[in-house]
């Protein structure tokens, strides 16, 4: 959106390990030698942590607040004010909200760490991509009915009328379709229709003990929409899994595919 890269911009991810400000960023396949040179599209297809974090650190490392401000323009950090209790609150803290913003904060934020974004906020964001850039507040109640008559309707509320430019929107929609069609999210796809979306795999912090205590737990997810060409449904699947590293594409993507195909089969108007 800031015009710094295109889908064809190339990053050399090397052997899957990249030193960053005293720490090492790794791709999931670093033990197999990594991916080498990848375009931005390919970085998202294979979920390259190295590629993603390098881009964000390279272009925003000198001004992290600009990156944070860009996220906020897309309203991904906005409370949803849902109709039911128990809503999680997003928390994305930039340099202005911290007494100390380390050099490693930005690259690790770029792959989902050091932030708190509830699944429904992520789904709302992807739904906006499917909805031509219009971000809509999720609602669980369409209308209140008494004795067969509607006594109150709950209209659709717009959170953000345009999360990004039409050019950026077209590019990211094409990439998200390739993530499923050609990338690690193939299990989320269907032979009956095209699916677009993105995988996610994150290690869950064990409270004050951080990421290194006891059994490692992972949150694997897939968020997307279908059919890609004329989106009608958006969905997120999140699974908490203990033990070895898990794959968002394989686990959550497979569940997404099964649900999507059932919905598709029941909706003859698609």
List the predicted regions and their residue ranges:
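Beta-lactam-recognizing serine transpeptidase/beta-lactamase-like catalytic domain environment
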Residues: 1-239
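Short amphipathic alpha-helical face segments that pack within enzyme cores
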Residues: 119-124, 251-258
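Short, gly/Ser/Thr-rich active-site loops of penicillin-recognizing serine hydrolases
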Residues: 150-157, 253-270
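A short acidic/glycine-rich loop-to-helix N-cap element
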Residues: 239-251
């Amino acid at each position: 959106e800031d015009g710094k890269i295109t889908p064809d911009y190339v990053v050399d991810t090397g052997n899957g390990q990249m030193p960053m400000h005293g720490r090492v960023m790794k791709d999931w396949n670093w033990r197999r030698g990594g991916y080498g040179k990848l375009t931005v599209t390919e970085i998202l297809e294979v979920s390259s942590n190295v590629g993603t974090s390098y881009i964000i650190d390279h272009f925003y490392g000198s001004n992290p607040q600009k990156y944070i401000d860009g996220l906020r323009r897309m309203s991904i950090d906005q409370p949803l004010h849902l109709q039911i209790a128990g809503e999680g609150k997003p928390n994305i803290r930039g340099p202005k909200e911290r007494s100390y913003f380390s050099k490693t904060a930005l690259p690790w934020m770029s792959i989902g760490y050091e932030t708190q974004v509830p699944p429904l906020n992520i789904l709302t964001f992807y739904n906006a991509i499917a909805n031509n850039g219009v971000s809509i507040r999720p609602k669980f109640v369409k209308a209140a009915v008494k004795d067969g008559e509607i006594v109150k309707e709950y209209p659709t509320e717009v959170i953000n009328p345009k999360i990004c430019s039409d050019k950026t929107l077209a590019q990211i929609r094409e990439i998200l379709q390739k993530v499923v069609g050609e990338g690690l999210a193939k299990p989320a796809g269907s032979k009956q229709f095209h699916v677009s979306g993105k995988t996610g795999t994150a290690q869950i912090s064990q409270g004050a003990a951080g990421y290194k205590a006891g059994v490692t737990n992972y949150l694997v997810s897939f968020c997307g929409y279908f059919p890609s060409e004329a989106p009608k449904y958006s969905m997120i699947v999140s699974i908490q899994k203990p033990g070895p590293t898990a794959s968002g594409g394989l686990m959550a993507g497979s569940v997404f595919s099964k649900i999507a195909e059932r919905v598709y089969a029941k909706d003859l108007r698609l």
